[in-house]
Amino acid sequence: MTPSQKQYLVIDLKSFYASVECVERGLDPMKAKLVVADLTRTEKTICLAVSPALRALGVPGRCRVFEIPKNLTYEVAPPRMALYVERSADVYSVYLKYIAPEDIHVYSIDEAFIDVTPYLSLYGCTARELGEKIRADVAKTTGIPATCGLGPNLYLAKIALDITAKHSPNFFGELDEESYKLKLWNHKPLTDFWHIGAGIQKRLAAMNIHTMGQLAMAPTEPLYKEFGVDAEILIDHAWGIEPTTIADIKSYKSQSHSVSTAQVFDHNRDTEGARLIFKEMVEALTLELVTQKLVCSSIGIYIGYSATEVQMEELRQTGDYRSWRRHIPSSSGTKKLSYPTNSRDELMAEVLSFFDERVIPSESVHRVGLTFGNTREETGPGIQTSLFQDNTVLEKERQRQDTINAIKKKFGKNSLLKAMDLLPEATARQRNAQIGGHRSGEETNEA
């Protein structure tokens, strides 16, 4: 490493949810056969985590319960999202023993990027040694094993984690630009590389590009024609280049914001049942807008319908859920509002009208989503409301929403419910006891 060269560490907690459940049960996370899944849902429910021992036997990390081979014996743990959030915070506390917050970028609940460059002289060690020390402390403190990647930029550190470390006996990968070219320019498939999904891989294949080496050597003009400005990122990554730093990420402020929610039903709903769920989602999101003192100027809805029996039989035979799902019908759309608002009554009317316009009444609904887009501060510059709005009515509604928020914050989300939330098809009570759409593990406390 040259004096000016950065060193980035990426730490990924191995099969995090499964590892937490193993530790809670006194099991070895690397040896126990365990999956985290909510069996109260359908057989198509996704396993939120699969332990390393099961993955070593060929079970995919994000499979569905019915896809696990019947001849395997394993334990099923129901999701406890509140516990996982708590353990993630415990791990972050370990990072803070060694690194300042401004040099840590939390990428997800189980993964973090760390700029270790300023700390090597402080601790008198190499980047690899510091990474090993932090990883060992995480394991000692929480019992959770981790995989590490190390590189001179965020991209190479991530690739060292995703590809190199997973083929290393000690689960620690290191790459620089030269070793990246040497080891991975001929690596297949391209979808193993960060930010390259099946769609991009298919478009590159149509250009006869199947490896990073071929991408690096390809003429740039066709790439820019096909991918636009994103071609620059692809080309940089093919050469192992990534100029973005953690400081850049910390200082970035998105120009466009939104709040959203989505649900996948455990049993299909008819049109009226789905309409009820949209009402509940409007209630939840408008409270979120009011809490954050935001207004929105657009709405977006998504309605995904259920599969036919013929399609279900095809799935059972092929097991290819991802390609199968592309053939399932759906309705979606966005609508610009006449003026920015966070009024519950106004947004309810807009969303239900848009739902009635877009829904296919003859279809059973399996999943829904709602987004309030282009959010901004309600008192920010450029905010113009309608000349026909009754400010007295709006102020009374605001006071009502503030009161509801205060009660829910003090006594729990289920402390105050509307009559519609008690209907059989409603999901608000159940979802109020969830985190990220999954069981929190504390349902009995509030549900």
Give the residues covered by each predicted segment.
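Short acidic, glycine/serine/threonine-rich loops at helix termini
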Residues: 20-23, 46-50, 156-164, 228, ...
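Long, highly charged, low-complexity intrinsically disordered interaction regions
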Residues: 129-188
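Residues that scaffold, gate, or flank divalent-cation-dependent active/transport sites
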Residues: 1-109, 113, 238
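Short Gly/Ser/Thr- and Asp/Glu-enriched loop/turn motifs at secondary-structure junctions
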Residues: 107-111, 151-154, 294-298, 363-367
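DNA-contacting surface of Y-family translesion DNA polymerases
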Residues: 3, 10, 202-365
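Acidic, metal-coordinating catalytic segment for phosphate/diphosphate chemistry
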Residues: 20, 326-447
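Catalytic palm subdomain of template-directed nucleic-acid polymerases
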Residues: 114-135, 208
